[in-house]
Swiss-Prot record:
Induction note: Expressed and active 2 hours after sporulation starts (at protein level); stimulates its own transcription.
Intervals of motif Polymerase core binding: 67-80
Quaternary assembly: Interacts with anti-sigma-G factor Gin (csfB).
UniProt record similarity statement: Belongs to the sigma-70 factor family.
Pfam families listed in its UniProt record: Sigma70_r2 (PF04542), Sigma70_r3 (PF04539), Sigma70_r4 (PF04545)
Keywords: DNA-binding, Sigma factor, Sporulation, Transcription, Transcription regulation
GO MF, one annotated term: DNA binding
Chain segments carrying region Recognizes anti-sigma-G factor Gin (csfB): 1-71
Gene for this chain: sigG
Organism: Bacillus subtilis (strain 168)
Top-level lineage group: Bacteria
UniProt name for this protein: RNA polymerase sigma-G factor
Entry comment, domain topic: Recognition of anti-sigma-G factor Gin (csfB) occurs via the first 71 residues.
InterPro entries found in the cross-reference section: RNA_pol_sigma-70_dom, RNA_pol_sigma-B/F/G, RNA_pol_sigma-G, RNA_pol_sigma70, RNA_pol_sigma70_r2, RNA_pol_sigma70_r3, RNA_pol_sigma70_r4, RNA_pol_sigma_r2
Function: Sigma factors are initiation factors that promote the attachment of RNA polymerase to specific initiation sites and are then released. This sigma factor is responsible for the expression of sporulation specific genes in the forespore.
Length: 260
């Protein structure tokens, strides 16, 4: 698959329209209240960039780009038909996991070499541990380091990571529409998660989305990268006291955003 291909399935990807949020909400109301098929078509065409962003993450699997694009469009159409405006969640946040799910099913059903569910679970747990160890030690962990944390044989970690072909960073963005990017980490399923936990996670993302750039940066460095207030202060050129004050204000504002 080529990242530079312009025409996919007869669609000129260099000229795809982009819908503004308010325009998108209006089209969804027309579709849901009036059954307007033209509104549905506009929503599909206006969100094809989502499909393009997702299929670029599967470019090393030897699949035809046209096939992946068509499968991704099926996921997009399903997300359009099932999207609920009342949840007050950005459409891209809802659609991207559905597009990824549709493509994963296609790849699973068409892959001559099936990877067992247990092996995939080990591989993705290993990726999570890898990212945590990098955050804690600032260096790349060995397969043996990861195996010790997960309490599984070293060979099993190596085999599991090889089996999923192209392990990527959990913090690699899958889609970015100018706001907060959607990361690989966001799409790794956890069977322990309930629907209520999923809704809480979406609420947290929406609450953080409304913070200013500096507040977002401080919270990411503190809680996602595990840095101390002093380390953050040195990186952005302010005092530790200022970081502490900004952090508290950001958390307070985020809590207010969530409960509005």
């Amino acid at each position: 698959m080529s990242r530079n291909k312009v025409e996919i399935c007869g669609v000129d990807t260099s000229k795809l329209p982009v819908l503004k949020n308010e325009e998108m909400r209006k089209l969804f109301r027309q579709l849901q209240d009036e059954g307007d098929d033209s509104a549905r078509e506009k929503l599909v065409n206006g969100n094809l960039r989502l499909v393009l962003s997702v299929i670029q993450r599967f470019n090393n699997r030897g699949e035809y780009v046209d096939d992946l694009f068509q499968v991704g469009c099926i996921g997009l159409m399903k997300s359009i038909d099932n999207f609920d405006l009342s949840h007050n969640v950005k459409f891209s946040t809802y659609a991207v996991p559905m597009i990824i799910g549709e493509i994963r099913r296609y790849l699973r059903d068409n892959n001559p070499i099936r990877v067992s569910r247990s092996l995939r679970d080990i591989a993705y747990k290993a990726l999570q541990v890898r990212e945590r160890l990098i955050s804690e030690t600032s260096k790349e962990p060995t397969a043996e380091d990861i195996a010790k944390v997960l309490e599984v044989p070293h060979e099993e970690i190596v085999f599991a990571l090889d089996a999923i072909q192209d392990p990527v960073s959990l913090f690699e963005p899958i889609y970015n529409d100018g706001g907060d990017p959607i990361y690989v980490m966001d799409q790794i399923s956890d069977e322990r998660n309930t629907d209520s936990q999923w809704i809480e996670e979406l609420a947290l993302k929406e609450g953080m989305r409304r913070l200013n750039d500096r507040e977002k940066m401080i919270l990411r460095k503190r809680f996602f990268q595990g840095k101390t207030q002093m380390e953050v202060a040195e990186e952005i050129g302010i005092s530790q006291a200022q970081v502490s004050r900004l952090e508290k204000a950001a958390i307070k504002q985020m809590n207010k955003n969530i409960h509005q």
